Each structure stands twice: as structure tokens, then as C-alpha cells.
A protein has these predicted regions:
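Alpha-helix boundary/interfacial micro-motifs
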Residues: 19, 26-28, 54, 65-68, ...
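Flexible, active-site-adjacent loop/turn segments at secondary-structure boundaries
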Residues: 8, 13-16, 45, 72, ...
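An amphipathic, aromatic/His-enriched active-site/gating alpha helix that lines ligand/cofactor pockets
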Residues: 58-88
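Short, well-ordered beta-strand segments in beta-rich or mixed alpha/beta enzyme
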Residues: 4-9, 44-69
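Pocket-edge positions in alpha/beta enzyme catalytic cores
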Residues: 18-21, 56, 82
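Short S/T/G/P-rich N-terminal loop/turn motif that feeds into the first structured element of a domain
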Residues: 1-34, 39, 50, 88-105
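A short linear hydrophobic-aromatic micro-motif
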Residues: 37-44, 79-81
């Protein structure tokens, strides 16, 4: 299945209600992903501009977009989602574009 990276920011409401609702909301987000045929592969909680980086699989872009809309509508997070390819897929793509030419040619 295609892989997607979601960059997530907590809203002010999300931060203010984290203690009471944080775990429940996290589980709801995961259920929403799964209801669209997706799968949460991993999530990393971060310092900096984004609060969470999630790695997900979805059957297609439409399902990924639906998940972003549904989960953003919960009000506690803002989501930016983008398709991603693995390092191996990237290398295959480069070979398809340029073949197996030696460096400098």
C-alpha cells in the first residue's frame, strides 16, 4: 500500500484538553484511519514546529485525504499529509529515469 507522512500540530483546544482527552482522541484518530482501509505504521512525538510525525499506509490518495479531513474536524489537531516513497523505491525511480550510468556520465 502507498505510504504517507502526516505532520501534525496540536490546536490550542487540543493542548488545553490533552490531560482529559488525549489518549481517547489518539485512539479515535487511529480508528478513523483504519475505517478508511489505512494503517498507522508509527508515530513520533516531537519538539519543534510539528508535534507529531505519523507514518501511515492508505489504499490511495482519496482515503488519505478523507482521513486528514475527518481527523482535522475533531478540532484538536491540524494535519498536513503527503505521499512518500521508501529509499529503495526512490533508487528504483532514479534508475528508471537515468539508468545505471556511472557517476559523472
Amino acid at each position: 500500500m502507498p505510504v504517507y507522512v502526516s505532520l501534525v500540530k496540536f490546536t490550542e483546544h487540543g493542548i488545553a484538553t490533552m490531560k482529559q482527552e488525549g489518549i481517547t482522541r489518539s485512539e479515535k484518530v487511529q480508528r478513523n484511519v483504519e475505517s478508511l482501509g489505512g494503517r498507522l505504521l508509527d508515530a513520533y512525538y516531537c519538539l519543534g514546529e510539528y508535534d507529531v510525525v505519523a507514518i501511515l499506509e492508505f489504499p490511495n490518495n482519496r482515503a488519505a485525504m478523507k482521513a486528514a479531513v475527518i481527523n482535522s474536524s475533531l478540532g484538536h489537531i491540524k494535519i498536513t499529509t503527503m505521499p512518500a516513497v521508501s529509499r529503495g523505491e526512490w533508487r528504483d525511480l532514479l534508475r528508471e529515469v537515468w539508468g545505471n550510468k556511472p557517476k559523472g556520465k
